[in-house]
Structures are given as structure tokens and as C-alpha cells.
Amino acid sequence: MARRSLPLLKHLLSRRIPARSVTYMHRPGDGSPRPVTLIPGDGIGPMVTGAVEQVMEAMHAPVYFEKFEVHGNMKAVPPEVLDSIRKNKVCLKGGLVTPMGGGVSSLNVQLRKELDLYASLVNCFNLPGLPTRHDNVDIVVIRENTEGEYSGLEHEVVPGVVESLKVITKFCSERIAKYAFEYAYLNNRKKVTAVHKANIMKLADGLFLESCREVATKYPGIKYNEIIVDNCCMQLVSKPEQFDVMVTPNLYGNLVANTAAGIAGGTGVMPGGTVVSYYCIVTSVFSSDYLPF
């Protein structure tokens, strides 16, 4: 992982940072502060990202934030926001609400497609001082983020009949499977579980499973198993400690990650992010629907 990060690290260190007021206090041997794109978002998003800003300031972290006001009711992500993320490589984002009904598409999905953020990673684990029903929970949910039911391919065939397409490709399935197994290998994880519904969606989820199985053969030191998504949810709430790394298609990963986060202490305190080779958008697992009282 260090070798892979070296070109990006050299690129960030070589950037000329314009002079500006920052909260960071230089220390001997430190380089220039790094810019991070900040999207406070909707609902409790500004509260969560604001807390992160306070932590960064208190620890004198070598970063400063380029803040943008983006909200879920906008028609599109502003180009300057995308340019900032491409430039800075790292973005801290609060939740963006997705309005119900037609007219406005999800800005979260737009971000994933524009930047090809194909992997969503959520780490759900017990936190000291936060009592939960289950102990020894340490689950990493890795979700394919660019296709499946979230492809946005919907249309009305005739009045009163809507067709929604689920797209699964071998390329994206293999890509997310490789990411999951590589993550497990690099982080000393012992098992990868593929979540599916191939007993019903035999072609779509069948292709996802076939891709996972092919990738699994290249990692003989990591145990691989499969579980149907409805049984997975039942097992999560009854015996979550049996899971390690979970790899899922898009929709299932959304449900599984939120369930696992709730078991481990709540969606507001579990770290997560969407990543590719060059960009990373870090967020908590909460929904923007959780509004402050």
C-alpha cells in the first residue's frame, strides 16, 4: 500500500499551496498544510463535519478546508466542487438528502458516477464507552457503488407501469471483488463474505457471485463464503461477530452497512468513505434524514 501511495504523496507535497489563514501551527519537519474539500451537506451533516473541523483544529492537523455549499435539492453537483475534489483528492462530506419522487436525481449518485467512485467502505466496530447489545463486532462492508439498482435507469412504460433496470457487469463485479480481497489481505483480515440474492436473480447476482469466486481463487489465504441477503440481515442482528469483510452489490450494501452500523453503536459514529485509485470521499454512515431537534 505504501508503494501505491508514494506517487500521490509526492504529488501532494509538490503542490504550491497559496498563503492563507489556517488553524494549523507549523512544527519542525512538517510540510505545508494539505487542502481538503468540505461539503457540510444537509440535515445533521454540518454538525458532524463541524465536529471534525474542531478535532482537526484542536490537534493542529496539517490540513485546511475548501468549503462548498451543496444541497440535495440542487439539480447537479456544481463543476467547481468536482474540480476541487479532483485537485485535492480528498473530500469530507456530510449527508445529502435525496428528494422523493421525480425531478431531482441523487447528488450522491452523481458524485459516484462523475468520479467513478466504485467502492464504498464502511467499518462497523464497537467503540469504547458506547454500550451495545453485541461485543466483538468488527465488520467492514465493501459495496459496489456504480451500478446495480442505483444505475438510474427507470422509465414509465405506460401510465401506471414503471420499469427499473438493474445492471450488473463482470467488469464492475470483478473490480469490487478484487478491492475487497486486496483490502482483506493488506489489513490482515481472515474472511470475505459475498452477499447476494442469486437464488432469485440468477443471472444478475449469479454474475456477481461468479466474479467473486474467480477472484477468491487468487487469495488462498483468505476464507471465502457466500450468504443470501435476507439470511445475512438475520445473522447480522443475531450473531454479527461471525462476519469480517463483506462484499456486496450496490443496493444490498446500503442495507447491510446501515444494519451493521446500527448494531455497532449507530450510523452517526461509524466511519465510511467512497474511494477509487485517486479520490476519496469520507463521510459518516448516517442519513441526512436525521435532522437536529
Predicted regions and their residues:
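N-terminal mitochondrial targeting presequence
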Residues: 1-30
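Glycine-rich phosphate/nucleotide-binding loop
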Residues: 7, 12, 79, 121, ...
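Glycine-rich phosphate/diphosphate-binding loop of Rossmann-like nucleotide-binding domains
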Residues: 31, 37-53, 158-230, 242
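Short coil/turn connectors at secondary-structure junctions
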Residues: 31-35, 61, 86-88, 116-117, ...
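N-terminal glycine-rich phosphate/adenylate-binding segment common to multiple enzyme folds
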Residues: 73-166, 251-255
